[in-house]
Amino acid sequence: MTLSRSSADDSTNNANRSYSAVAGTDNKRKRDEDSSDYVGVAESLEMLKKQEIDADHMAASAQQTLISWRSGENSRSLSSSGECSSSNRPESTRLQIFVRMMSGGKTIVIHAEKYDTVEKLHQRIEWKTKIPALEQRVIYKGKQLQRENSLTYYSIEQDASLQLVARMQSTEHPVAWQTIDDIMYTISRMYKGENLQSNINEKIVTFFAMIPVESDESIAKYLNIFSNSSVPAALVMLYASSLERNKSCAKSSVKLFLSNCVALPKNQKNYCLPIVLEFCKLLRKVCPDQKLYVTCRNTLGSMLETFDNPHGVYNDQYETFGVEIFPFFTELTGLLLNELAQNSGPSFCDFQKVSSFWQQLRKVIELKVAFPIPIVLPMQSTALEAEIRHLHRLFGSLLTTMDLCMCRVESSLADKEVGNSETMSSSWSQYLSILKIINSMSNIYQGAKGQLAVMLNKNKVSFSALVVKFAKRGDDHQWIFEYKEATNFEARRHLAMLLFPDVKEDFEEMHEMLIDRSNLLSESFEYIVGASPEALHGGLFMEFKNEEATGPGVLREWFYLVCQEIFNPKNTLFLRSADDFRRFSPNPASKVDPLHPDFFEFTGRVIALALMHKVQVGVLFDRVFFLQLAGLKISLEDIKDTDRIMYNSCKQILEMDPEFFDSNAGLGLTFVLETEELGKRDTIELCPDGKLKAVNSKNRKQYVDLLIERRFATPILEQVKQFSRGFTDMLSHSVPPRSFFKRLYLEDLDGMLRGGENPISIDDWKAHTEYNGFKETDRQIDWFWKILKKMTEEEQRSILFFWTSNKFVPVEGFRGLSSKLYIYRLYEANDRLPLSHTCFYRLCIPRYPTITLMEQRLRLIAQDHVSSSFGKW
């Protein structure tokens, strides 16, 4: 009879199992971190609805089965003494219990006796779900069932619904567990249709308030309670409910959770990121078109911006992290492409979302892809293979779309009828940042960087315009210098100038200088070297002793005059280039002066300050000097304009027929350099035992390289170092010393220090001049321009200097000056000399009665000693 009873039990259980769903695997999957068995919430919701119906049928079927079984049982006599004690109890003690996993909406049916212990219930669940009993927690009406108590202790009745969740390995946070249990219980009741006054938000606030601060490990364990208890899935399930009150409650709770995450300190926020990512994945499957999903995705993006502990948070699952965020990056890139195609943006916020996902995705690729980067496509089987192929397609789409955008920019720049610049700027504002992401992508694929270079070179005008308009101080512009050839002078100058701090116009913070013209160099040295970099960043207030004039015009004059003194060969600091007297390089012999290091540091500061204040001082650097400032190697071609004789000799050595060269014993050359300094001749070995090492056709390239280095670089190494130190003092903090010069070509620096190479255009000068007290048609104005055209270029520059304290015109011409020029009528004697107010670019002349008298007066002030002393302010 016992055997017969057992068979009946088994058949009943088997029948019931045929209707029940398999549950309890999701939390175990989370503990095992096995994402491959993930079941989407959308599918789970459908399963849940079906299971509710199945459960009803199952309950009726089970009840009928039990009635039939009990009828048969009543007709039998139970004779076996080995039957379990429950067989002697009344049949009414038999319970049918529904056990549900909230994360997946799955339900199983368990049969038990009222007086069975909770431990027995755990064993039955283990038998059905394969989840170890020790890893289970069963919740009923918000309370966890303790294993030693009976089911009747908790008043569990027929068809009761219990909730199965995974037991955490640690019980360090019982209050947090209770808080989460309360949340899950409330969600369960609301989902069943109960109209409750929700306390979920209050519980979420409580949960966040208890996050530990002791260590990353304790933070991770604590926050895992939230995800391992399936709260994200439960809230999303509630949000997908057809009841508006449920949807509203879930929406409020999710948004509260997100805002609390964002407000956390960085280390705690890092460990919240996997939970936010889980919310995003769930919402994307259930409601991708609703605002809550967009809010969640945006929150994830903002958290990714500061996420810098991937290995601590994801351990060995970092590759999985990359796979999980890739769909969001793809989605956002698609939106970005659409906005670009429509010429409607994107906005900074839209771009920032794409950028934050890309930065993390790039790190994953660099760390996890087994192949060397750049990658050659197609690849063999590797991590992230599908994502890398898809990413390459996105790169192509972005490159093509930005090509079209750049063409539109160039067309707009050429179209004078285009709307105001602010409207244009709003639609172009993120183009440069998007190009930066495209460049970052191009580093991953072989040949991609060349494709980007072709596109930028093709769109040089628009690319340069974007750099000038949108490259801002403090941004990372280093990537642009990989495409230096795709930029023009204005773009490169703009990028270099961004390395300087803003010139402040606050008179209270200006560094004041009162200098005697007769002692210009030494007094200027004391004022500049004795000041801190911060004081000089605050601006300069310049005044010459016994003169009334002050202001920007006087400052421009001082810059010009002090640079003329510094680079005067009589002062032995610098030497003129043999082939171009406008160019200078440090004098190797200057080291005999004990003050020479300080004077080169002073020179570096003065040149940097002149560039900061956009004053053309009229000196040019020798190419060799410029290359050393940029930290670049000097080649043979670089000395062509520095020492033509040595250049020709070295070139002849390198181009000579190898057999002829060797047959003539390398012209008798050895690895030495003959020098003469301060009348003393010396022989310097270019390498160890250089006197004994003969030059031949195989080592002549090495000989020339060493010769150039020893002849041009080594002798002025200390001077270059001191100049760089002074120059770097004037740059913004944390800017590498050589970065300014690396951003430029030598010709760019020429334009910044001396202005345009072309002769002054009188027509351009006239076009940028306005009149006060005169009309353009007055004969005095006509005479003025005729006289100016007759003057030599040096006389014209002297007039310009008297007028503006600028002796050189910017590369762009007169439009490059900070203001238009003005001719004012002087209401005094009609034969007096002109006056000027250099700060305001204002020239004052009387109404001269004859052209001859005007020419006399203008030629008088065109003399250097006059043009430097007649201006007022």
Swiss-Prot record:
Catalysed reactions, semicolon-separated: S-ubiquitinyl-[E2 ubiquitin-conjugating enzyme]-L-cysteine + [acceptor protein]-L-lysine = [E2 ubiquitin-conjugating enzyme]-L-cysteine + N(6)-ubiquitinyl-[acceptor protein]-L-lysine
Active-site positions on this chain: 839
Null mutant phenotype: Accelerated senescence.
Region of interest (Disordered), residue spans: 1-37, 70-90
One Gene Ontology biological process: protein ubiquitination
PROSITE patterns attached to this UniProt entry: C_TYPE_LECTIN_1, HECT, UBIQUITIN_2
Pathway membership, UniProt: Protein modification; protein ubiquitination
Residues annotated as domain Ubiquitin-like: 95-171
Location relative to the cell: Cytoplasm
HECT domain: residues covered: 532-873
Up-regulation conditions: By jasmonate. Down-regulated by hydrogen peroxide.
Function (record text): E3 ubiquitin protein ligase that regulates leaf senescence through ubiquitination and subsequent degradation of WRKY53.
Name of the protein described by the UniProt record: E3 ubiquitin-protein ligase UPL5
Organism for this UniProt entry: Arabidopsis thaliana
Gene: UPL5
